[in-house]
């Protein structure tokens, strides 16, 4: 069954411009308070100009272009401009450092990068080291360094016509994006997302929160994340609603932004809720038009009740991951909600709890949460150039193993219990323990290392490192944290360090992590 009617992203934007014309499509607010607004017609024209820009730089169907950007209009222009010419977006987490960004460039085969001045020195060094296939960099800032292979994105875009110059044949099965996500291995994997995936995500997420064209969907989630793209942006655009993209989250500013833009839908993670709750109470806390707050794991019932009571909102729970594209289990529009359940399987999906032998379990029994979808349509297509990793999580008949533990009740409500894999959830970011351990293990004084997540009242989990030093060595906290800050993104840097004589292991030599909690 073709739910999206065979329409790829190029057709979507041409249709949206025709149908909604001068209606506001996108509002972007920068950290400095600068606001840019675009109608559906204007946004489609900016997307066309950006597509033409890429074409003039030699980008063709199937080429990969990396984006290392904070939330900004240019991210939206590039995302859909690339899709219009059949090229592939490779978003890079804006908080990653050189080593991590180099890995993504190398393993995505990106040949062009769009970024801003603050990240340019890092990529200049990457180019000098000849560590990737990058042949050109576009900077979105007005000031431009006098370096070869660097262009002004804005100047080039403004020179382009507002009609599309290059329109190769497209299929909904074509890849639109490769989104690298942390896993249980030491390196991130590239999740392949098709035009169909994104079109379906728009319709599905719009259904999930009963979105209409008179809604205003505001998000502070980073544009390089799947939730901003598929739960928010694609939902808003697919419904002809207004999408408000705020550059950075500020607990002090957030509620004022919700009120200023008359938002009817927004999304929150636990870190946001906790930081909002410590703001001074205001008589205007309930002065808003929010109908739903899309919510993602994990919050206590006490915290949930206090937040909903203070701000007069309801939380619509949604559970998913990059590989599922959308929140495949969640609360349904008009249906009852059963906190702390994560909801029931959404339309087009099946969900089961399975045991270690891949057999379905009855209600009430703990096991792995597994989801059935259609690869390349309702769930991701594959991991880029990694068939072994794909086969490990995705069965031939479309069953996806999430690696998460949970159970369901007799009415089909699912409950999330814990993450099976060694992942730490930190302020909305997934952090791989193995990745951090491999980096820290390169310190010359460290013999053994394990990192674990510990409960944090603000950011879900904090990161604690347990290390064993080489004989005769000493290591100060200052030296340790300085090393980490130089070798990994800030959000991955451990908050705590404990030096031990040894680490607890089982008979097979594996570290017993639960003994370190």
UniProtKB/Swiss-Prot annotation:
Keyword check for Ligase: yes
InterPro entries: AMP-bd_C (IPR025110), AMP-bd_C_sf (IPR045851), AMP-binding_CS (IPR020845), AMP-dep_synth/lig_dom (IPR000873), ANL_N_sf (IPR042099), CaiC (IPR023456)
Gene that encodes it: caiC
Record Gene3D superfamilies: 3.30.300.30, N-terminal domain of ligase-like
SUPFAM superfamilies: Acetyl-CoA synthetase-like
A GO MF label: medium-chain fatty acid-CoA ligase activity
The protein, known as: Crotonobetaine/carnitine--CoA ligase
Keywords: Ligase
Substrates-to-products reaction catalysed: 4-(trimethylamino)butanoate + ATP + CoA = 4-(trimethylamino)butanoyl-CoA + AMP + diphosphate; crotonobetaine + ATP + CoA = crotonobetainyl-CoA + AMP + diphosphate; (R)-carnitine + ATP + CoA = (R)-carnitinyl-CoA + AMP + diphosphate
């Amino acid at each position: 069954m073709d739910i999206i009617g065979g329409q790829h992203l190029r057709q979507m934007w041409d249709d949206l411009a025709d149908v909604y014309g001068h209606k506001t499509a996108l509002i972007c607010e920068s950290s400095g308070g600068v606001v840019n607004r675009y109608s559906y017609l204007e946004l489609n024209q900016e997307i066309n100009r950006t597509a033409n820009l890429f074409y003039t730089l030699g980008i063709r169907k199937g080429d990969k272009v990396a984006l290392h950007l904070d939330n900004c209009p240019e991210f939206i222009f590039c995302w859909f401009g690339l899709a219009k010419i059949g090229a592939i977006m490779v978003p890079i987490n804006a908080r990653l450092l050189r080593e991590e960004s180099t890995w993504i460039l190398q393993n995505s085969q990106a040949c062009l990068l769009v970024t801003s001045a603050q990240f340019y020195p890092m990529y200049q060094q990457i180019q000098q080291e000849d560590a990737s296939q990058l042949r050109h960099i576009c900077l979105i800032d007005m000031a431009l360094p006098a370096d070869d292979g660097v262009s002004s994105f804005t100047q080039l875009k403004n020179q382009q016509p507002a009609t599309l110059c290059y329109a190769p044949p497209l299929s909904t099965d074509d890849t639109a994006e490769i989104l690298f996500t942390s896993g249980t291995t030491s390196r991130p994997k590239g999740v392949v997302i098709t035009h169909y995936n994104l079109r379906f995500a728009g319709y599905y997420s719009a259904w999930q929160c009963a979105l209409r064209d008179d809604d205003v969907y505001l998000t502070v989630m980073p544009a390089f994340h799947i939730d901003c793209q598929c739960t928010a942006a694609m939902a808003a655009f697919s419904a002809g609603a207004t999408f408000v993209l705020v550059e950075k989250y500020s607990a002090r500013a957030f509620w004022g932004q919700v009120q200023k833009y008359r938002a009817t839908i927004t999304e929150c993670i636990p870190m946001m809720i906790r930081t909002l709750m410590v703001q001074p109470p205001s008589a205007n806390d309930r002065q808003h038009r929010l109908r739903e707050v899309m919510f993602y794991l994990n919050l206590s019932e006490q915290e949930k009740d206090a937040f909903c009571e203070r701000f007069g909102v309801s939380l619509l729970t949604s559970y998913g991951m990059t590989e599922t594209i959308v929140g495949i289990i969640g609360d349904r529009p008009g249906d009852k909600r059963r906190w702390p359940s994560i909801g029931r399987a959404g339309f087009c999906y099946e969900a089961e709890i399975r045991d270690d032998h891949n057999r379905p379990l009855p209600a009430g029994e703990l096991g792995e949460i597994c989801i059935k979808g259609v690869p390349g349509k309702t769930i991701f297509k594959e991991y880029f150039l990694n068939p072994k990793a794909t086969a490990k999580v995705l069965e031939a008949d479309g069953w996806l193993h999430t690696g998460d533990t949970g159970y369901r009740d007799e009415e089909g409500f699912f409950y999330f219990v814990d993450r099976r894999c060694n992942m730490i959830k930190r302020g909305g970011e997934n952090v791989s323990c193995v990745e951090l351990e491999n980096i820290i293990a390169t310190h010359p004084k460290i013999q053994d290392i394990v990192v674990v997540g510990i409960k944090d009242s603000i950011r879900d989990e904090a990161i604690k490192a347990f290390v064993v030093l080489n004989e005769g060595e000493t290591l100060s906290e200052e030296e340790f944290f300085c090393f980490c800050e130089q070798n990994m993104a800030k959000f991955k840097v451990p908050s705590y360090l404990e030096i031990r004589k040894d680490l607890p292991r089982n008979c097979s030599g594996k570290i017993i992590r639960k003994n370190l909690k």
